[in-house]
């Protein structure tokens, strides 16, 4: 029986773009009986509103060709200089799960991994889903992921440690999501459920045969 996986792209990407950048990963997942779904973030804001340190990501990750703004799961909060997850993202993912799920796992890259990690603290509760609509997740994978930093989210992580089996992928040359940020999300998971996997590259989802084989081995250990 095919199992569905929810794939959350990074800042300024789209579902189609993320799919094109994860062909090798997707091929290996399909061999294991998984079907990958790539939604596109519902929020769009002007490139000028994006922090300077994310410029490299935007330049290397164009949208779907129809959007002139930057697609994102999160929105900037000008009053604090931080960010927040808007209700539009929650509502969109709620409906997406109902229409395309249920999902066995969730995989995120960069901002998508941050969102996936936050949702993994209480996937059904945060998205307003019953266990009939969405059974408990079987796994969670974060590539260049991070724990939300704004203060209003800390209680959620502290009261609901991520207990879903999780794989945290960190690039040794990643200058966008620093090791400390990856470690922050990793430390938000229970000790017996988390695994850290390094790769020699930067800020991207590796597609090499060696990497996807390690992911496959991790998934097979869960069954």
UniProtKB/Swiss-Prot annotation:
It comes from the Eukaryota. Its main location: cytoplasm. Gene3D superfamilies: alpha/beta hydrolase (3.40.50.1820). InterPro entries: AB_hydrolase_fold (IPR029058), FSH-like_dom (IPR005645), LovG (IPR050593). The active site is at 110 (charge relay system), 174 (charge relay system), 203 (charge relay system). Its EC number is 3.1.-.-. Keywords: Cytoplasm, Hydrolase, Serine esterase. One of its GO terms (molecular function) is hydrolase activity. Serine hydrolase of unknown specificity. Belongs to the AB hydrolase 3 family. This is Family of serine hydrolases 2. It comes from Saccharomyces cerevisiae (strain ATCC 204508 / S288c). The lineage of its organism: Eukaryota, Fungi, Dikarya, Ascomycota, Saccharomycotina. The gene is FSH2.
């Amino acid at each position: 029986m095919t199992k569905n996986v929810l794939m959350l792209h990074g800042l300024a990407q789209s579902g189609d773009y993320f799919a094109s950048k994860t062909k090798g990963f997707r091929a290996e997942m399909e061999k294991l009986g998984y079907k990958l779904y790539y939604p596109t973030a519902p929020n769009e804001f002007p490139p000028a509103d994006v922090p300077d340190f994310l410029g490299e990501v935007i330049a290397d990750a164009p949208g779907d060709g129809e959007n002139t703004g930057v697609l994102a799961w999160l929105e900037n909060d000008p009053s604090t200089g931080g960010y927040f997850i808007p209700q539009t993202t929650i509502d969109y993912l709620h409906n997406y799960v109902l229409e395309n799920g249920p999902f066995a796992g969730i995989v995120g890259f960069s901002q998508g991994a941050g969102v996936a990690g936050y949702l993994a603290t209480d996937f059904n509760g945060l998205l307003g889903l019953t266990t009939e609509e969405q059974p408990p997740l079987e796994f969670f994978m974060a590539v260049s992921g991070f724990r939300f930093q704004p203060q209003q989210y800390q209680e959620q992580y502290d009261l609901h440690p991520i207990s879903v089996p999780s794989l945290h992928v960190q690039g040794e040359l990643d200058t966008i999501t620093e090791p400390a940020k990856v470690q922050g999300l990793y430390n938000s998971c229970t000790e017996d459920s988390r695994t850290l996997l390094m790769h020699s590259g930067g800020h991207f989802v590796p597609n090499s045969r060696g990497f996807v084989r390690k992911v496959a081995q991790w998934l097979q250990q869960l069954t």
